[in-house]
């Protein structure tokens, strides 16, 4: 007899009266005076549990069934029947139940069947996927990731696995985690007293990557359309609801593409993945709309149907300066727009997703293409109502002399980027790309308030538990 997932039963894929086995964990148990017990059994395959109806004639009813509590794992064999009660179309009439695992002490079980705060759940991150909330987040996260891969594949992109250990600082910001096997109690020193990294594992300084972009450009300049999708790391000491030290990024890179091409790709990708999650995770999205953010579903539908607005950074600054609203962070040309500025543009002024383009060069990375005005670079941010920036990208600087100029301006040693510069020496082409912070995308989709609740085991300052 085959083991079937709960979702197949609840969605009617198993014929009525068929004999099946489901395996999962007990969410709740209730007993009637008529000698019948009802178990809510979930296996994570969908939001809702399956109800198992158990008669007291089962041989282990007294010794096992009446001892079951939330969190126990069970294997239930029985017949699929149409449910007479409300709440579900189908249930299972149990013919045999095997208890696979007991909860040691139900009184101290951290995941007792009640609503827990997200702050508490972070303290028990190894058990929190058993809750409705984090289970729904996990399924939505999976669907969004699969939709990104599917979209890229359909658009002819190749997935490239870029290294997590690097010697390059993509952003030039210096907020990187160092990778070393040196003995911290007995560091080797050079004659002038500095740490001698020649004796380290890689023979030089090495770090965890902040982005796969530079390596991705290498493959885009050979395969034309590639993307990376994996973890990135920032040693930024920010203990906020918007920051993680370890997070995932999706980073497409396209040869022979302009900034406008990248903006068009970003719009198409976001609409594709939002439609996928609405279609494939309707039950979980309904939960988020009911319990977390009543606009969760409507927000995605409006995003999908909206035409993206486009505005130059200079014009955006004018709009903000003349809007009559007082901002916590004053607006002037040359600043990096803050979240309040971004949200005003998307929510109040344009009332739609916005692509802000052509930022001042001094607030952007060295690899962004210099515009003809000598003051701005071909950079873009996609701003979404409700969250602000959701994607950042640019046309890359394909001219070697301009790239060297930017490296010098930012105090970066061009010899450290010798291989990146080679791409400009051997058949250089215009190319563009962007980065999508995956956890920020999940926050936007679900309405969750803290980014630490949309990644399985969050890493943040003073926190690397589990």
Curated annotation (Swiss-Prot):
Keyword Flavoprotein recorded: no
Name of the protein: Asparagine--tRNA ligase
GO CC annotation, single: cytoplasm
Pfam families, sorted: tRNA-synt_2, tRNA_anti-codon
CDD domains on file: AsxRS_core (cd00776), EcAsnRS_like_N (cd04318)
Gene Ontology terms, MF aspect: asparagine-tRNA ligase activity; ATP binding; nucleic acid binding
Enzyme Commission no: 6.1.1.22
InterPro entries for this protein: Aa-tRNA-synt_II, aa-tRNA-synth_II, aa-tRNA-synth_II/BPL/LPL, Asn-tRNA-ligase, Asp/Asn-tRNA-synth_IIb, NA-bd_OB-fold, NA-bd_OB_tRNA
Gene name per UniProt: asnS
């Amino acid at each position: 007899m085959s083991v079937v997932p709960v979702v197949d039963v609840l969605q009617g894929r198993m014929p009525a009266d068929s004999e099946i086995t489901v395996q999962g964990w007990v969410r709740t148990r209730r007993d009637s005076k008529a000698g019948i017990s009802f178990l809510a059994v979930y296996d994570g395959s969908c939001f809702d549990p399956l109800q198992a109806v158990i008669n007291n004639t089962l041989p282990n009813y007294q010794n096992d069934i009446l001892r079951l509590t939330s969190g126990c794992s069970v294997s239930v064999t029985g017949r699929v029947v149409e449910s007479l009660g409300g709440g579900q179309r189908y249930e299972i009439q149990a013919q045999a139940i095997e208890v696979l695992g007991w909860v040691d002490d139900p009184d101290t079980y951290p995941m007792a069947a009640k609503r827990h705060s997200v702050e508490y759940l972070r303290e028990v991150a190894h058990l929190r996927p058993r809750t409705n909330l984090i289970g729904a987040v996990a399924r939505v996260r999976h669907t969004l990731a699969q939709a990104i891969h599917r979209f890229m594949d359909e658009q002819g992109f190749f997935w490239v696995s870029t290294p997590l250990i690097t010697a390059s600082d993509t952003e030039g910001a210096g907020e990187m985690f160092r990778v070393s096997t040196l003995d911290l109690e007995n560091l080797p020193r050079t004659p002038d007293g500095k740490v001698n990294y020649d004796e380290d594992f890689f023979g030089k300084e090495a770090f965890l990557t902040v982005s796969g972009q530079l390596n991705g450009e290498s493959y885009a300049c050979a395969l034309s359309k590639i993307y990376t999708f994996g973890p990135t790391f920032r040693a930024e000491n920010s203990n906020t609801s918007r920051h993680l030290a370890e997070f995932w990024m999706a980073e497409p890179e396209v040869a022979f593409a302009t900034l406008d091409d990248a903006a068009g790709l970003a719009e198409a990708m976001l609409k594709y993945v939002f439609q996928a999650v609405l279609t494939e995770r309707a039950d979980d999205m309904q939960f988020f709309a009911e319990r977390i953010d009543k606009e969760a579903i409507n927000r995605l539908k409006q995003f999908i149907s909206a035409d993206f607005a486009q505005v130059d950074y200079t014009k955006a600054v004018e709009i903000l300066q003349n809007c009559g609203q007082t901002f916590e962070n004053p607006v002037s040309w040359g600043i990096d727009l803050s979240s309040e500025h971004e949200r005003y543009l998307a929510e109040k002024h344009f009332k739609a997703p916005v692509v802000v383009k052509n930022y001042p060069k001094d607030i952007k990375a060295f690899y962004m293409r210099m515009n003809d005005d000598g003051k701005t670079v071909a950079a873009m941010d996609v701003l979404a109502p409700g969250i602000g920036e959701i994607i950042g990208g640019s046309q890359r600087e394909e001219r070697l002399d301009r790239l060297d100029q930017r490296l010098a301006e930012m105090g970066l040693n061009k010899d450290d980027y010798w291989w990146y510069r080679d791409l400009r020496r051997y058949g250089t082409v215009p190319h563009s790309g962007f980065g999508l912070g995956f956890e920020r995308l999940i926050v936007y989709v679900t309405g969750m308030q803290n980014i630490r609740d949309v990644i399985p085991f969050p890493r943040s300052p003073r926190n690397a538990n589990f």
